[in-house]
Regions:
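N-terminal active-site beta-alpha-beta segment that forms phosphate/nucleotide-binding
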Residues: 1-115
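Conserved phosphate- and dinucleotide-binding cores of soluble alpha/beta proteins
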Residues: 81-188
């Protein structure tokens, strides 16, 4: 399955077909892996996401970043089509944005990608080589090239797909975190 449209369709359907208890267990397993991961524990500035459309919920991770006094950044889709990483002090600051997704407000401080230690990136599918298939808007592919830290995809075990083809503009991730483990891309 290498056609991105077919991959997106199949993975979205599979995510949405998960029972709530399966989603909750996956979120718990992923959070446990991230919270114990040395890369996460060393990160002072973490760029993450608020789950939507069946994505793995990172709620416990977001709360841990805030509780530990580290910097939590969340994405905001801007009117010009760009994505920015904005600092939040509490999850209560979030409101539905451009695509109906919960995001920081326009007054939340912007952080440059070069200041991020760890980016936890959603995706529709991931390859073991780091290829990431996103929603199709290219937001992360435009944002991640400026990242100096580690980019880690987050998904369910079934979102690891063999044979994904990268396009010229696709930006790979260094790791993929799933309920089943943390994959160092290109190492297996």
């Amino acid at each position: 399955m290498t056609d991105k449209r077919a991959v997106r369709r199949a993975m979205r359907a599979r995510r949405m077909a998960l029972a709530e208890c399966e989603r909750a267990q996956a979120a718990q397993d992923v959070a446990g892996r991230i919270l114990a991961w040395p890369v996460y524990r060393a990160a002072r500035t973490v760029f993450a996401y608020v789950a939507a459309r069946g994505e793995v919920d990172l709620g416990p991770v977001l709360c841990d970043v805030l509780a530990s006094g580290r910097t939590l950044l969340l994405p905001r889709c801007e009117a010009d089509g760009a994505m920015t990483a904005r600092r939040v002090q509490t999850l209560d600051e979030l409101a539905p944005g451009t695509w109906g997704l919960d995001e920081p407000g326009p007054d939340a401080p912007v952080c440059a990608p070069g200041r991020i230690d760890l980016a936890l990136v959603p995706g529709v599918a991931f390859g073991r080589d780091g290829v990431r298939v996103g929603q199709g808007g290219g937001y992360y592919d435009r944002y991640l090239p400026g990242l100096r830290g580690v980019a880690a995809g987050v998904g369910y075990d079934f979102q690891i797909v063999d044979g994904l083809q990268a396009s010229a503009h696709d930006v790979p991730v260094a790791f993929v975190v799933t309920p089943g483990g943390i994959i160092r891309c290109g190492q297996e």
